[in-house]
Swiss-Prot record:
Mg(2+) 1 binds at D114, D120. One of its GO terms (cellular component) is cytoplasm. Isopentenyl diphosphate binds at K75, R78, H107, R126. The gene is fppS. Binds 2 Mg(2+) ions per subunit. GO terms for biological process: isoprenoid biosynthetic process. This is Probable farnesyl diphosphate synthase. CDD domains: Trans_IPPS_HT (cd00685). It comes from Bradyrhizobium diazoefficiens (strain JCM 10833 / BCRC 13528 / IAM 13628 / NBRC 14792 / USDA 110). PROSITE patterns: POLYPRENYL_SYNTHASE_1 (PS00723), POLYPRENYL_SYNTHASE_2 (PS00444).
């Protein structure tokens, strides 16, 4: 595994805001979301390919499966959230790319484990056979374990000032702990076949998927402004944004499990209902859930409005989620 920027890395010393230059803005000076999102996703994928490579003896089946889990599709939303928060200041692009890659490794870890027969038992992910289907269940378990380790190793190896690597590791660890994704998944499994209140589902979603969204934003901000009491108001705004945006993404996912097809989802539709899993969509109904998602996205935008143009990229990710919802779950 190669870590950090190399002497030949042409990103070194270039900020996330400066790496695209004028091409990222239209004639009006407005930042073009399709340009920076495509470029950001490409840079993170290049970092993943660099970080997840065999060093000496060729590619093992485990490494091949790890690359399969991380390099074949995905919207890269969490990495883009990190990059967008990193754009709050002139953060070195190479640092954000590697942090974004670490986040995507951890996200892939959670997906690989969630898809296992003992968990959600899914056979499709991102339009391809899930890791346990293609490589076997034992390898899939090891893939998740190894991706988690590589994510932390990537952060610990960053060429970053002060205690930044420690703070980043702490944020990511907290996101997947018993108070985060792992705890949320445990609750999700425990609710199968039960009638529960909406508040219980919302709390579960905030842990299972929302915690990693929050960490993605906070990790980008840590790269931009560090750990400083002077930025308490900034982190408060970002946490509110993350809470609303992360929950909105999961509500949209609940809706699309009902309304979208395999091509749009990249996974098997109707799985939640078939497994008797309570969701926001099943409890609220599709139209109420849709409005709930729209309200959450609006609240996310209001949370970062005081940050002004610095938060332009975070706002554009809200717009992308809105467009995705309108495309795949139009109003009845």
């Amino acid at each position: 595994m190669q870590t950090g920027s190399t002497p030949h890395d042409d990103r070194a010393g270039v900020s996330a805001n400066g790496i695209l230059g004028a091409q990222a803005r239209g004639a009006s000076g407005r930042l073009l979301p399709e340009i920076w999102m495509q470029d950001g996703a490409k840079r993170v994928e290049e970092a993943l390919a660099r970080l997840l490579c065999a060093e000496d003896d060729g590619e093992t089946e485990l490494m091949a499966a790890m690359r399969y889990a991380t390099l074949h599709g995905g919207k890269r939303t969490r990495a883009l959230l990190c990059l967008a928060a990193g754009a709050l200041a002139d953060t070195p692009a190479h640092m954000l790319d590697d942090v974004g890659a670490a986040i995507e490794m951890m996200h892939a870890c959670t997906l690989v484990h969630d898809d296992l027969p003992a968990m959600d038992d899914d056979v499709l992910r991102r339009g391809l056979p899930t890791v346990h289907v293609k490589f076997g269940e034992a390898t899939a378990i090891l893939v998740g374990d190894a991706l988690q380790a590589h994510a932390f190793l990537t952060l610990a190896s960053l060429n970053a000032p002060g205690d930044s690597p420690i703070a980043l590791v702490r944020e990511l660890a907290q996101a997947v702990s018993a108070e985060g994704a792992a705890g949320g998944q445990a609750i999700d499994l425990s609710l199968v076949g039960k009638h529960v209140e909406l508040d219980r589902i919302v709390a579960m979603h905030r842990m299972k998927s929302g915690a990693l969204v929050r960490a993605s934003v906070r990790m980008g901000a840590l790269c931009a402004v560090g750990v400083n009491a002077a930025h308490a108001a900034l982190y408060c705004a970002l946490d509110h944004y993350s809470a609303c945006f992360g929950l909105a993404l999961q509500v949209i996912d609940d809706i699309l499990d009902v309304t979208a097809d395999t091509a749009a989802l990249g996974k098997t539709p109707g799985k939640d209902a078939a497994a008797q899993k309570p969701t926001c969509a099943s409890i609220m109904g599709l139209q109420e859930a849709r409005q709930f998602a729209l309200d959450l996205l609006r609240d996310a935008g209001e949370a970062i409005a005081p940050l002004g143009p610095r938060a332009e990229r975070l706002a554009q990710l809200i717009q992308r989620a809105n467009a995705y919802l309108f495309k795949h779950a139009p109003r009845a």
